[in-house]
Amino acid sequence: MAVDKVIVKQRNIILVGIPIDESGVEVLKWALEEVAKHGDCVVVVHVCFTYYRALKSKSSLDRYLKPYIEFCSTKKIELKGEVLKGNSVLGVLVKEAKRYNAMSVVVGVKQQSKLSLKIAKGCAKELPSTTDILAIHRGNIVFRRSNHYQLPLAQKISSRPSSELSEGFSDKDLAKTTGQEKRKISGRSLSLPSVEVVDQTPGWPLLRTSTLATPMVQHQTRKISVVNWVMSLPERFPHHPNQTCQQSFCDKQLKDILKDINRWFSYDVLKTATSDFSLENLIGKGGCNEVYKGFLEDGKGVAVKILKPSVKEAVKEFVHEVSIVSSLSHSNISPLIGVCVHYNDLISVYNLSSKGSLEETLQGKHVLRWEERLKIAIGLGEALDYLHNQCSNPVIHRDVKSSNVLLSDEFEPQLSDFGLSMWGSKSCRYTIQRDVVGTFGYLAPEYFMYGKVSDKVDVYAFGVVLLELISGRTSISSDSPRGQESLVMWAKPMIEKGNAKELLDPNIAGTFDEDQFHKMVLAATHCLTRAATYRPNIKEILKLLRGEDDVSKWVKIEEDDEDGFDDEVYPNSNTELHLSLAMVDVEDNDSVSNSSLERSNNSLFSSSSSSSQELQS
């Protein structure tokens, strides 16, 4: 078979970079079976460093590709080979990918290490976002920068692992991304779809504000933050040209997901429970949803969330959240107790918490005893352990925070609000997400800076909640001295100097278990390890909190670790600048409640982050 260079037009080109050995066979076979489709053209590239080696390798490549000719003929795939001379494999692959305008570039890695991923990440940096970059190790995707937007719903429906479907881009691409953002305020949510504006102030891109649609809505939101957990962000999915779908498709997904829900509420029952959805019972309002409190005939309190699908993204949001929550069953996770579909209204029904949220309780008049705080910490940890390790499909919550932890009369915690959650992966360490969502003050550095998502982002946020339980402080406070608005930044120097007791909530001084206190501080410190690779998983943290692990082991780990970075790079940052920008337009302490945020990939993404100077082991 000829190996001359042939430029093929009007076809999808898959460029496969291989060595001529067994590992190359594995990569080529995977690309032909998993990536190439009917009518595509697969161009196999082998790079040699000398002309002599290139000349010698041409006949070898012909023999190498021969076994796949029949397979490609059956699938109507055109297979071509190139042996090229170059000083850099990366440089040659990038040049050829641009020349062919390749749809995908597939490379193999011999071991999962930073060095092995260098070529894949280099391609992701140099090639346009329209090119799909995949790195394969033993038949598994170990790195991917996708060329299309993949909704979480599609991840659930597909039979392929979510890690293979997740899209994103390389670390440095994300860090260098520039653009402008439009801010939309609704309730306590902040949505930042990308639009073009001028004179964007450099620095922290996620500006927080207390400005709401009307003063009345603002007052309601503050007053009833107990049910804020049930509120969704106004726009879960940023506008994107590839996101449009036919209404029939959305209807089908609704039916597929909702058919397994055990309890369907009639609209009349919910109408009666909420006094005809009266304004007096309106306890929250989002961009396209409203939440009402109500009481069923048996006296059970419920939070009724009505989603008005004025846009198709709202339907997807509803399906996605319901599909995840309905699959969960754990005593420390707030359950979805039913749904209702009434004409264009999509309604979900949740329990109405009697004690409110952990955030409310910590900031309220009731003082949580130490035993109650430890109980809440362990219960929340068990909920995360269930999501990460016990579900058939792992779940990453992505918005763990004190306002999303509901408390029963016995102070048993329940994790709630799965509107930002996503399906995790058992095969990949992390996925890259185009959109960073979550709450300022709880975002893990690798997620905020590079969009890297794994169960470790929940572990980091759990560490912030532990600090809240220890100190009684909020994750972000405008009343704190400049540079200490972040709870993590406030706690860091005290822990580093060995003055952990200064963290303790003065309301419980003298009434706490000192041994348990030090274990919780140690757990929080390890949860807040800057590099995700060295951050423990939630199961390990739980053992420490329960007293099942020897504390001396954890102290030794803390002393031995050298703040490893793996392939995560956190540049030095001007923390004060970032925090001052984050506090723009904050008018009073009430308005500094934790706002969930979203950002599309085109938004301004500063190359520095205050997270990079947060607690580390």
From Swiss-Prot:
Domain Protein kinase: 277-555
Keyword Kinase part of the UniProt annotation: yes
GO process terms (BP): gibberellic acid mediated signaling pathway; gibberellin mediated signaling pathway; positive regulation of cell division; response to gibberellin
Chain positions with Phosphoserine modification: S403
Induction entry: Induced by gibberellins (GA) in seedlings shoot apices, in tissues containing actively dividing cells. Down-regulated by RGA in the GA signaling pathway.
Modification sites for Phosphotyrosine: Y350, Y447
Chain intervals for the UniProt region annotation (Disordered): 162-187, 590-617
Residues of the signal peptide: none
Active site: D399
UniProt name for this protein: Protein kinase STUNTED
Taxonomic source organism: Arabidopsis thaliana (Mouse-ear cress)
Gene symbol of the encoding locus: STU
